[in-house]
Amino acid sequence: MLRFKSRNKEYVFDQPVVMGILNVTPDSFSDGGKFNEIDTALAHCETMLNEGTAIIDIGGCSTRPNNAIATESEELERVIPVVKTIRKHFPEAILSVDTFRKSIAEACISEGADIVNDISGGLFDDEMLPFIGKNHIPYVMMHCVGTPETMHQYKLEGNIHQTVMDFFKNQHKKIEPLGDQQIILDPGIGFGKTIESNFALLSNLEEYRFNGYPILIGISRKSFIFKTLGCTPQEADNGTTVANTIALLNGADILRVHDVKKAIEAITLTSHL
C-alpha cells in the first residue's frame, strides 16, 4: 500500500498507481522536445490526469546514455515554470520532481511539488538526503552506481537483489536519525545493469523491499525491453505493458510510465486476480 503526507494532506492508495512522465527536456531518450514548452507540457499533464495517473513526474535533466547533463541553471529554468503552471491549473494534482540536485528539489517543493524522485538515491548530491530527512519529504530512492557521466558504463551482475538491498540500507542509514521517513524504493532497472539483472529485479521485488517500503518500477521503453524485442523505444509500449504486468504481479506499488492509459489497464486487469 502506498501512503504518504504532503502539503498538509494524507494520501492513501489501496491499489497500485501510475506516475506519468512529463519530460520538459529537449533530449530525453523517448520523448525529448515534445513537452518543453509550457502549453504542450500543460496539455500533456491534463491528458495524463484524465487517463487516471495519480502522480505527475516532472523532469528537466535527461540522464540517457552518452548525453550531456544539463547544468543546474538549465534544469531550474525548465522545471520551475512547469511546476508553477501545473500547480495553478491543477491544484489537487500530486506532483513529483525528477532530480538528483538538492537545490532543484528544494525550489520545486517550495513551489508546490509533493515528491522528490532522485535517480541517484542521494548518491550524486551530499545535501539531498539531509534535506529530505529533515523535512520528511516523500522521496523515491533509486539504486544507482557511479556518477551522472559514468552510471551507464556499469553492468552489474551476480546477486543483484543483495546489491540493491545493501544500497537501500546504506543510504537509509544517512537519514534514519532524522526520524520517520516517507521512502519509496526504486531498484533502478535499466541503470548500470545487464539485461539478465533487469529481469531478475523485475521478477522478485520482495528480495529488496527494505523496511516494508513501497516499490516504484520505472521501465517504460527501457533498452532491456526494446533490445530484447528488437524494436525501437517508440515501438516498445506493448513490451512495456507486459513488463509492467509482471511487476504488478510481483508486488509493485507505482508504475512510472510514458503511456498512462496502458498502465491503468494493466492495473485494472491484475486487480481482478
Residue ranges, per PLM feature:
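Catalytic-pocket segment enriched in acidic/His residues
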Residues: 26
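Catalytic domains of carbohydrate-active enzymes, especially glycoside hydrolases
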Residues: 43-59, 250-251
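Charged catalytic and DNA/RNA-contacting regions of genome-maintenance
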Residues: 1-4
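Active-site-adjacent loop and "lid" segments of alpha/beta metabolic enzymes
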Residues: 6-7, 13, 30-39, 43-44, ...
